[in-house]
């Protein structure tokens, strides 16, 4: 829970522990007084897809997308690859209409909404965000676009950088 005090500082209360922490340094910009900040992970469930493993042949072959298919606000679907997925993996690794897909690596944060009338599987370098409640997913696409543009999101790590599930969960929106 994020709240302000009388001095307009922002604080977050962790419900599990009751701890209160000042988060002024994390607030990217001011918002209207009737709005509230929260963590992305509180309104979206999120997970990544399946890692490519050439020796794993369990399940059935399905087409899937990688970061090379995901662009800002669109998908390039002319050359899809196939990989084996088990029934259990399908539940975690399948995007459905309305899901916001976000690149973990490469152009970190690059996003698009899956608006097709059929499901698609995702590789492990793509985060799938599915809202817990009905909301305007396009708004959150624009938030990701803005945050990428102003440098609020970026990669972490030495070598190949990425946007971890934990970092994505903790993005303030």
Which residues make up each language-model segment?
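Extended, domain-scale alpha-helical bundle/helix-rich regions
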Residues: 1-19
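A generic structural signal for residues embedded in beta-strands
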Residues: 102-103
């Amino acid at each position: 829970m994020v709240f302000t005090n009388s001095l307009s500082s922002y604080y977050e209360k962790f419900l599990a522990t009751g701890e209160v922490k000042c988060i002024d340094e994390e607030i990217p910009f001011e918002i209207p007084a009737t709005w509230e900040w929260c963590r992305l992970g509180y309104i979206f469930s999120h997970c990544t897809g399946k890692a490519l493993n050439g020796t794993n042949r369990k399940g059935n072959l399905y087409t899937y997308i990688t970061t090379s298919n995901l662009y800002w606000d669109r998908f390039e679907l002319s050359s899809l690859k196939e990989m084996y997925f088990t029934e259990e993996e399908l539940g975690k690794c399948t995007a459905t209409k309305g899901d916001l897909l976000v690149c973990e690596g490469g152009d970190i944060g690059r996003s698009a909404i899956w608006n097709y009338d059929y499901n698609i599987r995702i590789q492990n370098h793509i985060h799938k965000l599915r809202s817990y409640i009905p909301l305007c997913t396009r708004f959150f696409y624009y938030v990701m676009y803005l945050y990428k543009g102003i440098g609020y999101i970026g990669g972490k790590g030495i070598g190949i950088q990425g946007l971890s599930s934990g970092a994505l969960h903790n993005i303030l929106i």
